[in-house]
Curated annotation (Swiss-Prot):
GO terms for molecular function: beta-N-acetylhexosaminidase activity. Belongs to the glycosyl hydrolase 3 family. NagZ subfamily. Pathway: Cell wall biogenesis; peptidoglycan recycling. Pfam families: Glyco_hydro_3 (PF00933). It comes from Shewanella sp. (strain ANA-3). It catalyses: Hydrolysis of terminal non-reducing N-acetyl-D-hexosamine residues in N-acetyl-beta-D-hexosaminides. The active site is at H177 (proton donor/acceptor), D249 (nucleophile). Its main location: cytoplasm. Substrate binds at D61, R69, R134, K164, H165. It is found in: Cytoplasm. This is Beta-hexosaminidase.
Length: 342
């Protein structure tokens, strides 16, 4: 069935974690900085995971900028919000750079047998400090153009894209990791601004997955988007025509606590339309679900396996050493340009 994505405590898989990974409802694993000490160790960890569950979807938040879990042995990817300024506002150059950075981010993960980065961020850069330069821009048309190029670079490496945080996290100050953000704007502002990157990239067929925000938009619906059948079934599926995988954001975040304990949160997310739920940084929470939750009898309509890499494309990309090297130099060039401004 495979509705659950969980995490690990440290640099290898404990016997208790191995038992959890064997559970039929576990279909995904997300890695964090605590699971990484070196590229060699990471490769060994992934091999250990694959021996236990060969088909499991292995993911990471590896957007670039301050959200990059693996650093030593990996290229430091610039923050998405630094691309257009580094190109001095030239969108033609910025799009080319975004494509190469998407390729670079993806190929360095795929080379370690990691399937997926939860990227890119499609939020607009507004008042949210937790988003900030994780966003490509404050303007929807710039987010769309740059994200499209970044996603195309990912695809050229063989990796699918997961857009987040639907329908937009940029206009709330609160951080949903530690608080319950509420976006008090009228529906018109959200539909005419924030939702546009999701809408257009879905129409282009660029998004394999979407992660909704743990944000309440009370002028639209009383529930956080990730627990809202209106947002996920009516808007995302029906009106926008999205047919990829919907991942919940981490159900351990404060913004998810409105739905009660983990059993309540999981039920709310699945009822709303999520295909895979994430529970991070809380092993007892994971165990409560594996032991006490009544999972759906049928498999997800949009299984997370849809996000597995295009192996043939990845094999070709891995042989393109010159593109990889040129992209690394580009990333360093943008980083240096940004440091010179500080």
């Amino acid at each position: 069935m495979s509705y659950l994505m969980l995490d690990l405590l440290s640099l290898d898989v404990s016997e208790a974690e191995a038992e959890m990974l064997r559970h039929p409802q576990v279909g995904g694993l997300i890695l964090f900085s605590r699971n990484f000490s070196s590229r060699e160790q990471l490769i060994a960890l992934v091999q250990q995971i694959r021996q236990i569950r060969p088909e499991i979807l292995i993911a990471v938040d590896h957007e670039g900028g301050r959200v990059q879990r693996f650093r030593e042995g990996f290229t430091l990817i610039p923050a998405m919000g630094d691309i257009l300024p580094a190109a001095k506002g030239d969108m033609v150059i910025a799009k080319r750079w975004a494509c190469e950075l998407g390729f670079l981010m993806a190929i360095e993960l795929l080379a370690c047998d990691i399937d997926l980065s939860f990227a890119p961020v499609l939020d607009l850069n507004g008042i949210s400090q937790v988003i900030g330069k994780r966003s490509f821009s404050a303007k929807p048309e710039e987010v769309i153009a740059l994200a499209q190029s970044f996603i195309e670079g990912m695809a050229e490496a063989g990796m699918g894209a997961v857009g987040k945080h639907f329908p937009g996290h940029g206009s709330v100050a609160a951080d949903s990791h530690i608080a319950q953000p509420i976006d008090e704007r009228e529906a018109e502002a959200i539909f005419n601004q924030d939702i546009l990157p999701f809408k257009d990239l879905i129409a282009m067929g660029k998004l394999s997955g979407i992660m909704p925000a743990h944000v309440i938009y009370p002028k639209v619906d009383p529930n956080p988007a990730g627990f809202s059948s209106y947002w996920l079934k009516q808007i995302l599926r029906k009106e926008l025509g999205f047919n990829g995988v919907i991942f919940s954001d981490d159900l351990g975040m404060k913004g998810a606590s409105i739905a009660g304990d983990y059993l309540g949160r999981a039920q709310a997310a699945l009822d709303a339309g999520c295909d895979m739920i994430l529970v991070c940084n809380d092993n007892p929470g994971v165990m409560s679900l594996l032991n006490g939750f009544v999972w759906p009898a049928s498999a997800p309509q949009h299984p997370a396996s849809l996000l597995k890499p295009n192996a043939a494309q990845t094999a070709i990309a891995l042989e393109n050493a010159s593109r990889w090297e040129n992209a690394k130099q580009l990333a360093e060039q943008i980083q240096l340009a940004q440091q010179a401004k500080v």
